[in-house]
Curated annotation (Swiss-Prot):
A motif (Prevents secretion from ER) lies at residues 111-114. One of its GO terms (biological process) is vacuolar proton-transporting V-type ATPase complex assembly. Coiled coil: none annotated. GO terms for cellular component: endoplasmic reticulum membrane; endoplasmic reticulum-Golgi intermediate compartment membrane; ER to Golgi transport vesicle membrane. Belongs to the VMA21 family. Residues 1-39, 95-114 are cytoplasmic. Required for the assembly of the V0 complex of the vacuolar ATPase (V-ATPase) in the endoplasmic reticulum. It is found in: Endoplasmic reticulum membrane; Endoplasmic reticulum-Golgi intermediate compartment membrane; Cytoplasmic vesicle, COPII-coated vesicle membrane. Keywords: Cytoplasmic vesicle, Endoplasmic reticulum, Membrane, Transmembrane, Transmembrane helix. PANTHER family: VACUOLAR ATPASE ASSEMBLY INTEGRAL MEMBRANE PROTEIN VMA21. The gene is VMA21. This is Vacuolar ATPase assembly integral membrane protein VMA21. The chain crosses the membrane at residues 40-60, 74-94.
C-alpha cells in the first residue's frame, strides 16, 4: 500500500540545502582548471594532424614521382609513415609519463602501483 506524502512538511526547491554535492558557496572560488593539461591536448592534436597529413601527403608525393604510378608501393609507404607517426606518439607519451613520475616523487603520489 502506498503512503501519503505530507506536502506541508516537505521543503520546497528553494529551501533545500545547496551544500550537498552542488556548486560551491558564493564566497568560495570554484576550480576551473582543466582536467587534462593543455600541453597534453596540444600534443594529441599535433599527432592527430600528423596522422592524417603525413601518410596522405607521402602517398600523393611519391605515387608519380618516386614509384612511377605504382600505387601499391606508395600505399605501403603511406602505411609505414602512419606507423612512424604512431610510434613517435608512443615515445612522446612514455617520455611524458616518466617525467611526471620523476617530478611526483614517490609511488604513493596519486597513481596506483602496478
Amino acid at each position: 500500500m502506498a503512503t501519503r506524502r505530507i506536502i506541508s512538511q516537505e521543503k520546497t526547491l528553494l529551501e533545500k540545502d545547496d551544500s550537498i554535492g552542488s556548486s560551491p558557496a558564493a564566497d568560495e572560488k570554484s576550480n576551473i582548471a582543466p582536467a587534462v593539461p593543455t600541453s597534453v591536448i596540444m600534443k594529441l592534436l599535433a599527432f592527430t594532424l600528423g596522422m592524417i597529413v603525413i601518410p596522405i601527403g607521402s602517398y600523393f608525393a611519391t605515387v608519380d614521382s618516386v614509384f612511377n604510378g605504382n600505387s601499391t608501393y606508395a600505399g605501403a609507404l603511406a602505411a609505414i609513415m602512419a606507423n612512424v607517426v604512431l610510434i613517435g606518439y608512443i615515445f612522446v607519451a612514455m617520455a611524458e609519463d616518466q617525467s611526471d613520475q620523476q617530478e611526483g616523487g614517490g609511488p604513493g603520489d596519486g597513481k596506483k602501483d602496478r
